[in-house]
Structure formats: structure tokens, C-alpha cells
């Protein structure tokens, strides 16, 4: 169902002979079901999605919104169960604001799909949220629970700000959650993610391609860390000017991670990690490797995706006793600058190779 409130506004002319401007209606709409929201979105510039129960196999399709539209999630948003690829929610448009009202939640109830296989088999699981072709837009304060697999897919976006978003998949730690990436960024420019709070079982952030990407003030727990890549093997394989700062990585497999695809091409350049705190990292505190093939390392780095202009500063914390503090496997790595890097615990690697001389980097 939907309710409309039309607000009429006009500009008055001060000149006696000037014509009266045309009145334009702008609608504020509250939707309580997905079908009405999808059908009525084009008539509204303020949209409230109130306690929406999205039917199984349906995308809550908020694509093609009018410029300047404000969409707010209110109450509890849920989704019916079906094995399909999704997405559960999709947005596109320019100058769009997407936010959550106080006390709202978007609960995917992912345990219905979780089987410890993620996107690698088992049940077909829907991705959660496509932020595709969002331009000059903002996502703020969304509270997301239990995504079946990946949460936010940011692709083809430009000048997108993502503020104070939480992704809580902590229930998946013991219930088979897998491949529950929080933010996957591809083919985008000017993406700014601030204040994210993530509990999941995969990358907190994965930048696969894009320029001018920032992640700052985040907390990442339970997953695979803050990642560049894997880079290579896609249509767009350029990663440039990425800044990851002032964030915490807790109880995760990895901390800082950069991985490129063996035999592929495409540059990774001007990457900064600064002010990163690590705690109880299970596998690698810092891992940089150019040897990924079919999603797994081969131990044989290739040079087709060079990593240049990598700055690490003020990276501190600890790894578990069985973990590796720093692991670097490079075939083409240049112009690095590391300072204030102190990762303690674990066992040092004796297999590092290709570290740029004079960079300050060490295993």
C-alpha cells in the first residue's frame, strides 16, 4: 500500500507584468509493500519503505530514481526465501539519499541459505544490495543483518558516500556463513566509506577495480580483512588511488591484504594503508601476493599486475601464535614506502620475495 502527500510550491514574481511560474508537485510516499514501491517510485521524491516484506525471488527495485530522491528504510525489512542470485535490493540514480530511520533493520535472515559454501556451491544464494550506477549520492546509517552472501556491491558508481553502515553477519560464524563480503567495489570512482561496522566471514572491503576509493574509521571483525583485489581477469583491472585509514581489524583471518591474479594484466598503484590496528589475526597480518589463480595462491608470482606506490604507515597490532606477521610474494613491486609498521606474534616467513629495495618493507 502507499500514501501520498503532495506539497505544492511556486516562486512568486516581484514584477507586475511577469508570468506566473508553473506549479510542480513533489510527492512524499510511504510504501508498506514491495510491489507498490516498485510501481510508484517514479512518482515520488521522498520515499519511506515501512516494514516491507519482499516476496521470495523479488528484487526491491529502486533503480532509475528521479534526481534528488530521498529513500528511507523504516521498521523491519525482510525477504522471502528462494534459491536465486538476487539482488535482494537494487538502487541507481543521481543525487539520491538512502538512509535508515531510527530503530530500523534490514534482516536478510541469511541462515536459511548458509551452508558453509557461500558462492562456491551448495544453495544458490542472493546477493544483498546493488549500489550500481549511483552518482553523486549518499548511503547513510543502514543497519543490515545476516546477508546470504555478499552485502554491498558498489559498481559503476561515481562520487558515492557511504556513512555509518553496519553489516552484522556474526551469526554466520557458527551457522555456515561464507563469502559474506561487506563492501565489494568495482569500476567506480570517488567512493568514500566512513564509519562502517562489519562482522562477517569474508572481506570487510574488497577493491577489485576503481579510482579514488577511501575507507576510513571502520571496524572489521571476523572476516578476511581490508583488501585490494583480487585484481586481474576482469573487464576493468585498474586500481588507483585507494586510501584505507584509521580502522581496526579484529579476530580476522587477515589484516592488510593485496592480491593479484597470476598471468593477468592491470596496474595497482597509489595505495595507502595508514593508522590500521590489528588484533588476533589468524593467518596473515599483512599479506601481499601476485600469485592468485582460481581463487587460490600458487606460490609463483607473475608480473602482469604490478603493485607500485604502496604506502604503509602506522600499522600495528598482533597475530595469533600460528599466524604470519608479514608475507610478501612479488614479481613486480616498485616504489613502496613503509614506516611505523609493527606486527607482533606468530612466526616470521622465510619465503618472502621481490620486496622493493629501500622501501622499509620487511617480513
UniProtKB/Swiss-Prot annotation:
PANTHER family per record: POLYGALACTURONASE
Propeptide residue interval(s): 18-26
Disulfide bonds: 29-44, 204-220, 330-333, 352-363
Reactions performed catalytically: (1,4-alpha-D-galacturonosyl)n+m + H2O = (1,4-alpha-D-galacturonosyl)n + (1,4-alpha-D-galacturonosyl)m
GO cellular component term, pick one: extracellular region
Gene Ontology biological-process annotations: cell wall organization; pectin catabolic process
Positions annotated as glycosylated: 212
Localization (cell): Secreted
Keyword hit for Aminoacyl-tRNA synthetase: no
Molecular function GO terms recorded: polygalacturonase activity
Predominant localisation class: secreted
PROSITE patterns, A to Z: POLYGALACTURONASE (PS00502)
UniProt key word Hydrolase: yes
Enzyme class (EC, first level): hydrolase
Family matches, as InterPro entries: Glyco_hydro_28 (IPR000743), Glycosyl_hydrlase_28 (IPR050434), PbH1 (IPR006626), Pectin_lyas_fold (IPR012334), Pectin_lyase_fold/virulence (IPR011050)
Keyword tags: Cell wall biogenesis/degradation, Disulfide bond, Glycoprotein, Glycosidase, Hydrolase, Repeat, Secreted, Signal, Zymogen
Protein name, entry field: Endopolygalacturonase 1
Signal peptide residue numbers: 1-17
Amino acid at each position: 500500500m502507499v500514501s501520498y502527500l503532495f506539497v505544492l510550491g511556486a516562486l512568486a514574481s516581484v514584477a507586475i507584468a511577469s508570468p506566473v511560474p508553473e506549479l510542480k508537485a513533489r510527492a512524499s510516499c510511504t510504501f508498506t509493500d514491495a510491489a507498490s514501491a516498485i510501481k510508484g517510485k517514479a512518482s515520488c521524491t521522498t520515499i519511506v519503505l515501512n516494514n516491507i516484506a519482499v516476496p521470495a525471488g523479488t528484487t526491491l527495485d529502486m533503480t532509475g530514481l528521479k534526481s534528488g530522491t530521498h529513500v528511507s528504510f523504516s521498521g523491519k525489512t525482510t525477504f522471502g526465501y528462494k534459491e536465486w542470485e538476487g539482488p535482494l535490493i537494487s538502487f541507481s540514480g543521481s543525487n539520491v539519499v538512502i538512509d535508515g530511520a531510527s530503530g530500523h533493520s534490514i534482516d536478510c535472515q541469511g541462515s536459511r541459505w548458509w551452508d558453509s559454501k557461500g558462492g562456491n556451491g551448495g544453495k544458490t544464494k542472493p546477493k544483498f544490495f546493488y549500489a550500481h550506477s549511483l552518482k553523486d549520492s549518499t548511503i547513510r546509517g543502514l543497519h543490515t543483518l545476516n546477508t546470504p552472501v555478499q552485502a554491498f556491491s558498489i559498481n559503476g558508481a561515481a562520487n558515492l558516500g557511504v556513512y555509518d553502515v553496519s553489516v552484522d553477519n556474526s551469526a554466520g560464524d557458527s551457522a555456515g556463513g561464507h563469502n559474506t563480503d561487506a563492501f565489494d567495489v568495482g569500476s567506480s570512482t570517488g567512493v568514500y566509506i566512513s564509519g562502517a561496522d562489519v562482522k562477517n566471514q569474508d572481506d570487510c572491503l574488497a577493491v577489485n577495480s576503481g579510482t579514488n576509493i577511501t575507507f576510513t574509521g571502520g571496524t572489521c571483525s571476523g572476516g578476511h580483512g581490508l583488501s585490494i583485489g583480487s585484481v586481474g581477469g576482469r573487464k576493468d583491472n585498474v586500481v588507483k588511488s585507494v586510501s584505507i585509514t584509521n580502522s581496526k581489524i579484529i579476530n580476522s583471518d587477515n589484516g592488510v591484504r593485496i592480491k593479484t591474479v597470476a598471468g593477468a594484466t592491470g596496474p595497482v598503484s597509489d595505495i595507502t594503508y595508514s593508522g590500521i590496528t590489528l588484533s588476533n589475526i589468524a593467518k596473515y597480518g599483512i599479506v601481499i601476493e601476485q600469485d592468485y589463480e582460481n581463487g587460490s595462491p600458487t606460490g609463483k608470482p607473475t608480473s602482469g599486475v604490478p603493485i607500485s606506490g604502496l604506502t604503509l604507515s602506522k600499522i600495528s597490532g598482533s597475530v595469533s601464535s600460528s599466524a604470519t606477521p608479514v608475507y610478501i610474494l612479488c614479481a613486480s613491486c616498485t616504489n613502496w614506502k613503509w614506516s611505523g609498521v609493527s606486527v607482533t606474534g606468530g612466526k616470521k616467513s622465510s619465503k618472502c620475495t621481490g620486496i622493493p629495495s629501500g622501501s622499509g618493507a620487511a617480513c
